[in-house]
Amino acid sequence: MRKILFSIFIFSLSMIAVAISGKVIKVSDGDTLLLQSGSKRIKVRMYGIDAPELKQNYGEDSKSYLEKRILNKNIDVKVINEDKYGRKVGKVFYKNKDINLEMIETGNAWFYEYHAKKEKEYRKAFKSAQEQKLGLWKDKNPQNPRNFRLENKRED
């Protein structure tokens, strides 16, 4: 019985989302940033979105938008997990606003459905941005960043 209770306790701890706060000291691109949290520097990959790569159409615009919104600002990150590169993957909040969602709403990022299937609000915002031709959706044929990365990996 104790083993079962202990297992349930450990499992429930793993389900609790970790939150970190800090100041954004660098925006690498439209979905990655560097956070100064106390004495630690933490690389954060924004959950559920995929922004154009910097060498891709609209990549610099996406980065610039994110910089204007959160660079040198104090934010909160609800950490979902850690990726294979050691980055914290999470939802970024500035003044309680979901910046990940905002990046999709404004056409600055794609909804990364593969990693965030349950994010119905993200899916809805993605479709709305496409219909309104906002941001990267002004292009007639925008390329999914994932496909761009795959194509350019072959050329290296």
Protein language model features and the residues they cover:
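Small beta-barrel nucleic-acid-binding modules, primarily SNase/OB-fold domains
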Residues: 2-156
